[in-house]
Regions:
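Interfacial loop-to-helix junctions that mark the boundaries of transmembrane helices
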Residues: 1-5, 73-80, 131-133, 196-203, ...
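Hydrophobic transmembrane alpha-helices and their helix-loop junctions in integral membrane proteins
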Residues: 93-110, 116-135, 145-468
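Transmembrane helix-loop-helix hairpins at membrane boundaries of multipass inner-membrane proteins
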Residues: 1-9, 16-114, 186-200, 500, ...
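Hydrophobic alpha-helical transmembrane segments
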Residues: 74-88, 203-217, 423-439, 515-542
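Hydrophobic alpha-helical membrane-insertion segments
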Residues: 37-50, 170-178, 387-399, 476-499, ...
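Hydrophobic core of alpha-helical transmembrane segments in multi-pass integral membrane proteins
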Residues: 15-19, 39-50, 91-92, 180, ...
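Aromatic-capped, Gly/Pro-kinked transmembrane alpha-helices
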Residues: 493-536, 547-672
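Membrane-interfacial helical/loop segments at transmembrane boundaries in membrane proteins
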Residues: 59-68, 192-198, 408-420, 494-524
Length: 672
């Protein structure tokens, strides 16, 4: 069975899952079970279709459905196949996870199953649509279904986060539509992407289309300064939906940037400054994303900011590829794009695992606040181990997958800097430095997140009474954690496949073959493709260290309470998230402003000092204040003014109508 047949079958199964959830909506548990299990089957089918496409089974479909002017055109090539496979893995894990996690939404399980399945199906359609009309329809459906999942709790925070996401998503939609309609205008009015690929747009038109698309898809990806919805919406969505949004949906922003810049505008040729712009925004997003994450105590907000960081890292590879392609350095272009695609898949896996882990903590403790956790390793050992794998992967620690893709990104930036173009050299070096800073801060952040959540003693009754989550939730976490290990250790096999995918994207620029990228990859892969040896060495070293410690301490270790300056140890004494990041907070304090304050949250050993202390409980990044909160307050003031103008008096409304008619008549006379 070819890849397209399997893919269409998966869409049909997703629709069946959504329909089953609606038909069984009054039987809450049955609706949940049907939606999740059928969704898992659809994910398996689409995963197989995606892998077949990645390996070369490129297929398409072109038929008339509803509208003669807009053929229903789908294209499943190597690039779209990779993204289909990525989303399928997350959809499968999220479906299995939802068998228990959706129990947190009594009376809404059928609704959750319906929107979950339609959300997955709409993302699949966006990736494969080969026509402007159907692409935009699927894109809008994706935004709407994810919005309804964000607001499913129907409380103040979820509605606020969902509304902000809804607004930014539609700002991006307008920019994307403007880009596509501009291309349609210069491609003879055609809506088919195939005609865009065959049209040679002028440099000015191509640049306008790319910039519009970059910021439009950037709003969906969460690049700074269009990131404000991520820390508001991700924490409010169900955790398996957060995993799918952060791991999958925001990657559609990356897919869109690649599709427009390197596919639809391929006949026009990429320009150097496109790549420089992408790298600059990538560097800013990566550094600020992790800096903002460091200040968070809410574990899901922390992970949302890390999505901004990793989108920035992906954009570094995309930008380096574009700049190298414009300079005719095809080998570097392939290597850089391969690094970006590798990190795209890697981030989906480890961020998906981390969000599922955060959901497990919320499920067991009832809180997202890390300050109220602690001591969870002993109470939730499976979740703790799988979360540790995700934390090591996102921190780029070998032999996990994050290390491999970041290594290739470094090599791409270093090689791009040596191509003789001064502007490219400056930006590439700047990007490499930003990546190094990002890596150091990411390690610090996840030492904090893991240590404060899982180590030490419980800091609340809920943490002390926490238990391991049900088996389906553990399985979903374990699956993604295992994939993180495989993607790291399997780099020698996986990287060449991704080189082939990258070469297929860049091929329209003329004579770009996978062999050139493969040669450069083999030359500079170094430690990245040595991860199996690194893994074996680490296992041996850890085993030797544990054995040595065991032999040295037999019969010599006595357990006792830690000394606390004469006071009895209690749950308020361990280092908490606030103090752990205090040094970095001081260094980066111009980036933050207080969100709210509370007194006596930083406990001292002595009651006297405890009374005197008062620290910030949470901070808000300055860009979020300026770009999100200020416009929001402005709209609220306009709404208040409009309310005052209404007054409820019909005579006033008639006066408004008469005044409007007079204004329009005057304008008509003057124009006329």
């Amino acid at each position: 069975m070819d890849s397209m047949t399997l893919f269409i079958a998966s869409l049909a199964v997703s629709c069946i899952g959504a329909l089953a959830s609606v038909l069984l909506i009054k039987a809450d548990n049955a609706a949940k079970t049907a939606g999740c299990l059928i969704g898992a089957v659809a994910a398996v089918l689409s995963f197989v279709a995606g892998i077949q496409a990645v390996l070369g089974d490129v297929t398409s479909v072109d038929t008339i459905v509803f509208f003669p002017f807009a053929h229903f055109q789908l294209l499943l090539n190597q690039l779209s196949g990779l993204f289909v496979a990525l989303i399928s893995v997350l959809a499968f894990a999220g479906s299995i996870y939802g068998l228990n996690y959706f129990d947190e939404y009594p009376g809404k399980k059928g609704r959750a199953g319906f929107f979950f399945n339609t959300f997955v199906a709409s993302m699949m359609l966006v990736i494969t649509a080969d026509n402007v009309f159907w692409f935009l329809v699927a894109f809008e459906l994706m935004s709407l279904t994810s919005y309804f999942l964000v607001v499913i709790e129907e409380n103040e925070n979820s509605i606020h986060g969902g509304w902000l996401y809804f607004v930014i998503a539609h700002v991006g939609f307008v920019l994307i539509m403007a880009s596509f309609l501009t291309m349609t205008n210069f491609a003879g009015g055609s809506f088919a992407f195939a005609d865009f690929r065959a049209t040679q747009f002028s440099p000015a038109v191509a640049s306008v289309c790319f910039v519009l698309a970059f910021f439009g898809f950037g709003a969906k990806a969460g690049i700074i300064p269009l990131h404000g919805w991520l820390p508001k919406a991700h924490p409010e969505a169900p955790s398996n939906v957060s995993a799918l949004m952060s791991g999958g949906m925001i990657k559609i922003g990356i897919f869109g940037i690649l599709k427009v810049g390197l596919d639809l505008l391929s006949a026009s040729g990429v320009q150097v400054w496109w790549g420089l712009m992408v790298m600059v925004f990538g560097a800013i997003s990566s550094v600020l994303g992790v800096a903002f994450a460091l200040q968070e105590h809410d574990i899901k907000r922390l992970l949302a900011y890390h999505s901004v960081e990793n989108i920035g890292i992906i954009l570094l590879g995309v930008g380096a590829s574009m700049a190298a392609m414009a300079l005719n350095s095809v080998g570097i272009a392939v290597l850089a794009l391969m690094a970006a695609l590798y990190h795209t898949f890697n981030h989906a896996m480890f961020k998906g695992e981390l969000f599922l882990g955060a959901g497990a903590l919320l499920y067991s403790t009832g809180t997202r606040n890390m300050e109220k956790m602690g001591g969870l390793f002993r109470r939730m050992p499976a979740t703790a181990i799988y979360f540790l794998v995700g934390a090591l992967a996102i921190s780029a620690i070998p032999p996990f997958n994050g290390f491999v893709s970041e290594w290739f990104t470094y090599q791409s930036l270093f090689n791009a800097a040596m191509q003789g173009d001064k502007a490219v050299m400056i930006v590439a070096v700047f990007a490499a430095v930003a990546l190094a800073i990002t890596g150091a801060l990411a390690v610090t952040c996840f030492v904090k997140a893991y240590g404060v959540s899982f180590a030490s003693a419980p800091r609340s009754e809920a943490a002390a009474n926490a238990k391991e989550v049900p088996a389906p939730m553990v399985f979903a976490q374990g699956l993604l954690a295992a994939i993180c290990v495989v993607l790291g250790i399997g780099a020698p096999v996986i990287a060449p496949v991704l080189v082939d995918v990258a070469a297929s994207v860049l091929h329209p620029y003329g004579g770009v073959f996978a062999a050139e990228g493969m040669e450069l990859m083999n030359q500079y892969s170094g430690a990245a493709t040595s991860t199996p040896a690194i893994a074996i060495a680490l296992v041996v070293l850890v085993g030797l260290a544990c054995g040595y410690r065991k032999l040295k301490t037999v019969g010599k270790v006595q357990k006792s309470q830690p000394w606390a300056c004469g006071y009895a140890p209690n749950e308020h004494m361990p280092v908490v998230a606030t103090t752990f990041a205090s040094e970095v907070s001081w260094f980066m304090q111009p980036l933050y402003t207080l969100r709210d304050r509370c007194t006596a949250v930083c406990w001292s050993i002595a009651h006297f000092f405890q009374k005197l202390t008062g620290v910030a409980e949470a901070v808000e990044p300055v860009p979020d204040k300026v770009l999100v909160d200020a416009p929001h307050k402005g709209v609220e003031k306009l709404a208040d003014l409009a309310t005052k103008l209404e007054g409820g008096n019909y005579s006033i409304y008639i006066c408004y109508i008469v005044a409007a008619l007079v204004v329009f008549l005057v304008l008509a006379v003057q124009m006329g």
